Amino acid sequence: MNNSRILINNLKIFQGINQNVINLLLILFGTLLLTISAKVQVPFWPVPMTMQTFVVFLIGATYSVRLSFLTLVAYLFEGAMGLPVFAAGGGIVYLTGPTAGYLYGMTIAVVVISWFANEGYSSSYLKSFISIIIGSIIIFALGVFYLGSIIGYNKALQAGLLPFIPSELFKIALAVLLIPTLKKILK
């Protein structure tokens, strides 16, 4: 892994620690943030929101492509093994259930956002917006597509996309405002 591309490695607390240990700690920290963000619901209109996609955006913007991918794979593995990391619990059923497409979409989105960040797309608000909006589209496209294969595509749009647009726009705006600042802090 190219250490210069992992912004979070620049923190002084990691100086002198073996890179493999750092990577493991970052993966565990990422899965912890994903779990907490899946469990905590924030009142919002028209439906309550979790901050899970926001955490995906931050992981993608601050971790390397490989580390961000491994973090999401570890998160899915923890859930598949029965750990209650997902919004409604854990177990292999969540990887094939109605929301599985969103989970797989987050895994692809974090890699895409990380790739953009490694190409300099986290250095400005506009570039951050581009990478985050692409990531969000990936999450919802896969989520709605998979959900639609179960309940029908019209219902999937009505239940799995439209109610979440306001809260997703809020999370995108928050991430776009925060990522360039994080990049400056972590340099």
Regions inferred by a protein language model and the residue ranges of each:
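Interfacial loop-to-helix junctions that mark the boundaries of transmembrane helices
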Residues: G16-Q19, W45-T50, G91-G101, F129, ...
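Helix-loop junctions at the membrane-solvent interface of multi-pass transporters
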Residues: I36, V40, T62, G89, ...
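Interfacial aromatic-anchored transmembrane helix boundaries in multi-pass membrane proteins
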Residues: A38-P48, L76-A109
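Generic alpha-helical transmembrane segments of integral inner-membrane proteins
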Residues: L28, L32, I36, L58, ...
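Short helix-perturbing small/polar motifs within transmembrane alpha-helices
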Residues: N2-Q15, L28-F29, I36, I92-F140
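Hydrophobic alpha-helical transmembrane segments
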Residues: L24-F29, F54-L58, S68-V73, T99, ...
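Hydrophobic transmembrane alpha-helices
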Residues: N2-F69
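Membrane-embedded alpha-helical hairpins and interfacial helices in multi-pass inner-membrane proteins
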Residues: S122-K187
